[in-house]
Amino acid sequence: MLLFILLLLLSCHVLWLWRNRRFFNLYRKVGSRFPFVPFMGHGYLYLTNGEKVLNNLFKIGDHAISNGGMSTTWLLHRFYLMLADPVDAGYVLKHHLEKDELMLLIRYFTRTSSVFAKVAIWRPRRKIVSALLSHKNVSKFEPVFAKNSEVLVEQLRPLIGKEAFSIWEHLNAYTVDITGSTIFGIDVNSQTNLMEPLRLAINGIMELAAEVLLQIWYHVEFLLKRSSIYKQLLEYDHVVKCYVDKALKKHTDAASRRIKNDIEVPDDDHQISLLHLFAQLKEQRGIDHTTLYDESLGLLMAASDTTAVGASTAAAMLAHWPDVQEKAYQELYEVFGDTDRHMTIEDLPRLKYMEAVIKEALRLYPPAPHVTRKALEDIVLPSGLSVPKGTNFLISAYALNRNPKYWGPDADEFRPERFLDGSLPDQSLTIYFSFSYGPRGCPGIQFAMMSMKTSLGTLLRRYRLLPATVPNTSRGSAGPTAPLRFLFGVVVKEADNFPVRIEARHGK
């Protein structure tokens, strides 16, 4: 009996190898950081906690850097070719737009939002979303960013000189408030109430999505839809839907009275919202209620979560690198002096060092460190590697942003000056992948950068950021080399929730 079982398993494995021989040949040609296990592939790397899963992916990225810009991994039966060279990665992201089946699992959480949707759904919507998030439209939101940044610093005032706290909790509330205002045109007020239902629902959805990706059995739709996770998802979805429906009714009623021919932002600033613009397009371009809801949900989740993690990462890095923080503060002082005036859209281009700090923090720790694509046909990469149809690509922004071939020998160091001193390669070669790249790259880069510069700038004008614990002076002023520990997710989270301390500047 035992012999029969062993022979059956061996036969199944041989059959599997035969059916996947093209992928397995590519796996052997490229190589991998970890040994292959029959029936599991590298699945054992992902049957653990979120921190170890992410670290294993980072190790595969490190192997790709040292292996000519590529490595491989198997998630059970799914084969992935990881890319860490910008030429190959840029080619895939520009010409191969379909995401893999694993990312399509996220559709249970984002519905048909174009962020994770199939190309057939994404393509007709991309121009609309890009137009809504244009610089012209997003610039109108700066008063919202400035107003909520002032609320942020006031909410932090009681924490001056106290023990460490999670800066992410407050920046997450800030981003939920600004996305509520800019997307829905409603005041959420989660900064003054950290238990606000919309904020909890958004964060809950993202946590559930991460759990589904980590637990392989949830990759089976039948099991997922009968799980407690799915029941909880429906409860969170109902909370978000109530907010969206309320805002949709407000804006569709207004749009029905005044249909415009072009995408315009109203002159009255308090009316500005992306949903208002969506509603104007509802009848003009055949956008139905479901599309409005799904796109609003996707924008809300993407804008609030990624921006909060990005701003929190930059804040934590500033706390650990006081010399960098002082340079950023001096730049702010040159722009604002001793005044307490709000930040304006005209101020943002002058904050070049602050922008470099944010870019450098996100270079080292991109909020979405991996992007997937799927080859729908046989292709040849610019490097000359032949890739068979059906191959899943794992584009590692983490490895791409740390590849010393392009970033230099100090690629793992936190040095914002690299974006200002002309040391980077010619801009014709894209080497910065923190916001992805190509047609399906992040359409909200302007929104994210403006909101982060505003919140961090306002924060530094009032407070000095300090590490959660008193740093070891033997490390010098640069602080520890790896102060942050991240957990796997659709958008990564810091294991300790970005703890910092603050002290007032000049009695402010």
Residue ranges and their predicted role:
Residues 322-324, 393, 445-491:
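Cytochrome P450 heme-binding "Cys pocket" and the immediately downstream C-terminal segment
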Residues 131, 302, 421-455, 483-487:
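Cytochrome P450 heme-thiolate "Cys pocket" and heme-binding signature region
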